[in-house]
UniProtKB/Swiss-Prot annotation:
<dbReference type="GO" id="GO:0005737">
    <property type="term" value="C:cytoplasm"/>
</dbReference>
<dbReference type="InterPro" id="IPR014717">
    <property type="entry name" value="Transl_elong_EF1B/ribsomal_bS6"/>
</dbReference>
<protein>
    <recommendedName>
        <fullName>Small ribosomal subunit protein bS6</fullName>
    </recommendedName>
</protein>
<dbReference type="InterPro" id="IPR000529">
    <property type="entry name" value="Ribosomal_bS6"/>
</dbReference>
<dbReference type="GO" id="GO:0006412">
    <property type="term" value="P:translation"/>
</dbReference>
<keyword id="KW-0687">Ribonucleoprotein</keyword>
<keyword id="KW-0689">Ribosomal protein</keyword>
<dbReference type="InterPro" id="IPR035980">
    <property type="entry name" value="Ribosomal_bS6_sf"/>
</dbReference>
<dbReference type="InterPro" id="IPR020814">
    <property type="entry name" value="Ribosomal_S6_plastid/chlpt"/>
</dbReference>
<keyword id="KW-0694">RNA-binding</keyword>
<dbReference type="GO" id="GO:1990904">
    <property type="term" value="C:ribonucleoprotein complex"/>
</dbReference>
<keyword id="KW-0699">rRNA-binding</keyword>
<comment type="similarity">
    <text>Belongs to the bacterial ribosomal protein bS6 family.</text>
</comment>
<dbReference type="GO" id="GO:0005840">
    <property type="term" value="C:ribosome"/>
</dbReference>
<dbReference type="GO" id="GO:0003735">
    <property type="term" value="F:structural constituent of ribosome"/>
</dbReference>
<dbReference type="Pfam" id="PF01250">
    <property type="entry name" value="Ribosomal_S6"/>
</dbReference>
<dbReference type="GO" id="GO:0070181">
    <property type="term" value="F:small ribosomal subunit rRNA binding"/>
</dbReference>
Amino acid sequence: MRKYEVLYIIRPEVDEEARKALVERFNKVLTDNGGTVEKTTEMGKRRFAYEINDMREGFYVLLNVTAEPAATKELDRLMKISDDIVRLMITKDEK
């Protein structure tokens, strides 16, 4: 198992309840595929450096996870399908 950092941005117009459900859904994808979510940091709404798809801000979420590459690949696939995710980045944590 490897350590990963997952940073994703949720559309700003998603309400708080739906946003929390979305975070839980993506955490569950990782745990269902044998990974563990060590830390979830909701960084809040932030302004973008440049406009993305006619949006100027988004809600940032950072996950620190331990998982197999297949679990992160499945998470990446599901996040790319979701209309509520503006951007995502999954990186190996080398610590």
